[in-house]
A protein has these predicted regions:
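Flexible glycine-/small-residue-rich
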Residues: 100-102, 111-113, 159, 207-209
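Conserved ATP-binding/catalytic segment of the ANL
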Residues: 107-167
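Hydrophobic C-terminal alpha-helix "anchor/cap" residues
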Residues: 49, 181-184
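Conserved C-terminal "lid"/linker of ANL adenylate-forming enzymes
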Residues: 165, 191-201, 239-246
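Conserved adenylate-forming
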Residues: 1-106, 201-202, 209-211, 216-219, ...
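C-terminal boundary motif of the adenylate-forming
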Residues: 142, 185-212
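A structural signal for short hydrophobic beta-strand segments in well-ordered beta-sheet cores
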Residues: 98-100, 141-145, 195
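Adenylate-forming
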Residues: 116, 151-181, 214-232
Length: 246
C-alpha cells in the first residue's frame, strides 16, 4: 500500500499516532511507502512518523516526495535514495532538462522536456511570460544542492521565489526556509506559519498552534481555546521561540 497526502495531513496523522494505539496499529499494518507533495514537510513531522513506525513495527517506512506542477505533467524531480531528509527533491525524471538560474540570491529551477506544457490555452501572453529565451519553463521554485561536492545526490527545496519579499529596509526575506525553521523550532506546538512583513520594518509570523499547546497551559482539558492560548506558559513558549530564532 502506498499512502499519499499533503504535509498538513501527515502532521495530523503524526500527532494522532502518538496516543491512538488502534489508529497506529491499523494504519501502519500494510503501508510500504509514504508519499507527500504540495508543500515541504517539516523535519519534526518526519521524526514523529518514524518514532511511531519504530514503536509499532520495529522499522521505518520509506518516505518520499516529488517536485513539480500541473505544467510539468505533473512531477519533475524525484528522490531515488531511501535516505532522504525533509526538503530533499532528488534528481530529474528521465528526459527532463533542468536549468538553475541565479535570481534574488537563490537558484530558480527551470524545466525543458517532453512532459512540459507547450503553453496555456488561449493565453499567449501567459505562455510568453512562463518561458525564457531557451524555452525553459520558469517554475518560481528555488533549490539548492543536497551536497555541493556530490551533485549526484540531487537537489533540495529552498522555498518559492515568488513568495519571498523585501522589508522596508531593502532586506530580502526568504519565506520557505524561515517558515521551516519556525515549525521545527516550535515543534510539536506549531502546525503552520504565515510569514509577514512585506514593506514593513520587521518580519512577523502568524502561528497556527497544534492541540499540543493544551499540555503547556496547565488548564482543564475542556478549557476554552482562548484561555489556553493566553495561558502564561503558552505565551512564554512562543516568546522563547521568537527569541531563539532572532
Amino acid at each position: 500500500t502506498l499512502y499519499f497526502n499533503v504535509p498538513t495531513g501527515f502532521e495530523a496523522i503524526a500527532l494522532a499516532m502518538k496516543t491512538d494505539d488502534v489508529l497506529r496499529r491499523n494504519f501502519l499494518s500494510r503501508v510500504k511507502m509514504f508519499f507527500y507533495a504540495g508543500a515541504a514537510l517539516a523535519q519534526p513531522v518526519w521524526d514523529s512518523l518514524f518514532e511511531s513506525q519504530e514503536r509499532e513495527i520495529g522499522e521505518r517506512i520509506v518516505m518520499t516526495c516529488g517536485l513539480g506542477m500541473t505544467e510539468s505533467g505533473p512531477f519533475g524531480l524525484f528522490p531515488t535514495s531511501r535516505h532522504i531528509s525533509a526538503g530533499d527533491l532528488g534528481l530529474p525524471t528521465p528526459g527532463l532538462e533542468l536549468k538553475l538560474v541565479p535570481l534574488q540570491g537563490k537558484l530558480e529551477i527551470r524545466y525543458r522536456g517532453p512532459n512540459i506544457t507547450p503553453g496555456y490555452w488561449r493565453g499567449p501572453e501567459a505562455t510568453a511570460e512562463a518561458f525564457d529565451d531557451e524555452d525553459f519553463f520558469c517554475t518560481g521554485d528555488a533549490v539548492t544542492w543536497i551536497d555541493a561536492q556530490d551533485k549526484h545526490q540531487g537537489l533540495r527545496f529552498d522555498g518559492r521565489i515568488a513568495e519571498d519579499f523585501k522589508l522596508a529596509t531593502g532586506t530580502f526575506v526568504s519565506v520557505g526556509p524561515l517558515r521551516a525553521r519556525v515549525i521545527a523550532g516550535g515543534a510539536p506546538y506549531v502546525q503552520d506559519v504565515v510569514i509577514t512583513g512585506l514593506n514593513r520594518t520587521e518580519v512577523g509570523a502568524l502561528i497556527f498552534p497544534t492541540p499540543a499547546v493544551r499540555t503547556l497551559a496547565d488548564l482543564p482539558p475542556d478549557a476554552p481555546l482562548a484561555d489556553v492560548l493566553n495561558a502564561p506558559a503558552v505565551l512564554q513558549k512562543f516568546r522563547s521561540l521568537v527569541t531563539d530564532l532572532s
